[in-house]
């Protein structure tokens, strides 16, 4: 009896010895030396990597940004109010990543891709790194497809292509966000995914944008990533990279995406705050030395992919705010040098009632007519030149008392052209409507119409063509060319409308 009991015990002991795992699990840990202002200094964490996520005892997560000889500087992804001096921290061995899926369409999320619209969790099956490398030279192809904004001034003279980075720059309250939201509204039915990233904006401004998109049915193809002004600097710093990761998910699935960063100057300010608190040496305007790299690595992820990768695209519209028109400040010049052109919005034009307040003279698209359909190239070719000559003449005419007839005619034509470029907010126009408008203006058909009546005449002409002569729209949409037949139909419609007007 005693022997069998002893055998059982020895068998159990033998089994336990066999099952014993001799592997030692090494955990990279450290101790909090100091915490405050969204920054923690950690002693230990000897093997931590730059950019690695670290986890505090009470659950807060941070990113190791400064690796110094005696300690590690960590930025907190939260308020960190429960972190105490002396508490333990462990390195996770991971870098920041977010879940991605089709389920994000129509949702409002924060910089960690967590929903903040109160509509429940988002089901996801895979994840992407927040910071992923930009496509290489071989992975890209040149921009050739237009991305229509619905704004005549942009689509005719400063065209944007799929895969381009076009900066929207101007003083505060000049309609920069309105240009971006109008572009989103114009993508309805284009099978294009839009991502709007709000960095350090007022919560009321973000709510207004979301409401506009919902009312117009644009939220179903849009994702809003929002970190408002009261968010920690770390989350404001991460928000644009999160937006880029979400857009990349669709781009690599052979889809077209549009991402709007509103705005990188607030992003740079959040990064400056983090850097100064981490005691990194300040440079120009107290920004750290790598603030150019901050934006270049973000905007270089924008691409038109090669046919081997499925020809997906990601187009970016960063919005930068200037102080009293000073485009030579640090952040504006940085972003101008990274992007493929800029749309300059002028406070003077805005106050003069010219909206969108686009200064066509100093706005430029470095992709140019490659991002226009043939029909638009045919009619819009001389529009920019005529407007430039008009602006020059107008400045001269202020000092001249008696002008000859030709100059007076050119001034009158210019005033009518400028009237054509005015558009109401949230009322984007189709390419066909834009072609009608530009052709009518540049071919002297409006010279006999009073300036105050120009917009009314054009609206009626567009409606007349849509209802009475639908063949015009069919020709443009099917051939993408302003054919002789289309021109004949348009001329006929203008004559008929002139008689009715």
UniProtKB/Swiss-Prot annotation:
GO MF, one example: ADP binding
The keyword Thylakoid is annotated on this UniProt entry: yes
Pfam families: ATP-synt_ab (PF00006), ATP-synt_ab_C (PF00306), ATP-synt_ab_N (PF02874)
CDD domains: ATP-synt_F1_alpha_C, ATP-synt_F1_alpha_N, F1-ATPase_alpha_CD
Primary location group: plastid
Keyword Nucleotide-binding carried by entry: yes
Enzyme Commission number: 7.1.2.2
Recorded topology in the membrane: Peripheral membrane protein
Protein location: Plastid, Chloroplast thylakoid membrane
Record-linked InterPro entries: ATP_synth_asu-like_sf, ATP_synth_asu_C, ATP_synth_asu_C_sf, ATP_synth_F1_a_nt-bd_dom, ATP_synth_F1_asu, ATPase_a/bsu_AS, ATPase_F1/V1/A1_a/bsu_N, ATPase_F1/V1/A1_a/bsu_N_sf
Binding site for ATP: 170-177
Reaction(s) the record says it catalyses: ATP + H2O + 4 H(+)(in) = ADP + phosphate + 5 H(+)(out)
Physiological role: Produces ATP from ADP in the presence of a proton gradient across the membrane. The alpha chain is a regulatory subunit.
Summary of subunit composition and partner proteins: F-type ATPases have 2 components, CF(1) - the catalytic core - and CF(0) - the membrane proton channel. CF(1) has five subunits: alpha(3), beta(3), gamma(1), delta(1), epsilon(1). CF(0) has four main subunits: a, b, b' and c.
Family: Belongs to the ATPase alpha/beta chains family.
Protein name: ATP synthase subunit alpha, chloroplastic
GN (gene name): atpA
């Amino acid at each position: 009896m005693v022997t069998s009991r002893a055998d059982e015990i020895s068998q159990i002991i033998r089994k336990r010895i066999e099952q014993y795992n001799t592997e030692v699990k090494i955990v990279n840990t450290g101790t909090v030396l100091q915490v405050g202002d969204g920054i923690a200094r950690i002693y230990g964490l000897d093997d931590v990597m730059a950019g690695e996520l670290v986890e505090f005892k009470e659950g807060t997560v941070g990113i190791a940004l400064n690796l110094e000889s005696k300690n590690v500087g960590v930025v907190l992804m939260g308020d960190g109010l429960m972190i105490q001096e002396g508490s333990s921290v462990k390195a996770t061995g991971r870098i920041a990543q977010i879940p991605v899926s089709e389920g994000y369409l129509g949702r409002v999320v924060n910089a960690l891709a967590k929903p903040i619209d109160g509509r429940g969790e988002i089901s996801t099956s895979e994840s992407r790194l927040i910071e992923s490398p930009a496509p290489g030279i071989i992975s890209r192809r040149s921009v050739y497809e237009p991305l229509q904004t619905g704004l005549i001034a942009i689509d005719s003279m400063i065209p944007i292509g799929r895969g381009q980075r076009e900066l929207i720059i101007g003083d505060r309250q000049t309609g920069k966000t309105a240009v971006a939201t109008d572009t989103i509204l114009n993508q309805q039915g284009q099978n294009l995914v839009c991502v709007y990233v709000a960095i350090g904006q007022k919560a009321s401004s973000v709510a207004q944008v979301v409401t506009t998109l919902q009312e117009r049915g644009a939220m179903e193809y849009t994702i809003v990533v929002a970190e408002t002004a009261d968010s920690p600097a770390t989350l404001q710093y991460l928000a644009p990279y999160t937006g880029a990761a979400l857009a990349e998910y669709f781009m690599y699935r052979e889809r077209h995406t549009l991402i709007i960063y509103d705005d990188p100057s607030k992003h740079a300010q959040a990064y400056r705050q983090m850097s100064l608190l981490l005691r990194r040496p300040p440079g120009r305007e107290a920004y750290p030395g790598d603030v150019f790299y901050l934006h270049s690595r973000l905007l270089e992820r924008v691409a038109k992919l090669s046919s081997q990768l499925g020809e997906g695209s990601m187009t970016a519209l960063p919005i930068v705010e200037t102080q009293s028109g000073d485009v030579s400040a640090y952040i504006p010049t940085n972003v101008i040098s990274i992007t493929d052109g800029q749309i300059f919005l002028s406070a003077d034009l805005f106050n003069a009632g010219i909206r969108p307040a686009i200064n066509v003279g100093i706005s430029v698209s470095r992709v140019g007519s490659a991002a226009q359909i043939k029909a638009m190239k045919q009619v819009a070719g001389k529009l920019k030149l005529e407007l430039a000559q008009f602006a020059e003449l107008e400045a001269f005419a202020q000092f001249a008392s008696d002008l000859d007839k030709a100059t007076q005619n050119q001034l009158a034509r210019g005033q009518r052209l400028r009237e054509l470029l005015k558009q109401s907010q949230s009322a984007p126009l189709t390419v066909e409507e834009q072609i009608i408008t530009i052709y009518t203006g540049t071919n002297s058909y409006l010279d006999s119409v009073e300036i105050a009546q120009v917009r009314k005449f054009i609206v009626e002409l567009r409606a007349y063509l849509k209802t009475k002569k639908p063949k015009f729209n069919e020709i443009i949409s099917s051939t993408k060319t302003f054919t002789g037949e289309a021109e004949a139909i348009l001329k006929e419609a203008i004559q008929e409308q002139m008689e009715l007007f």
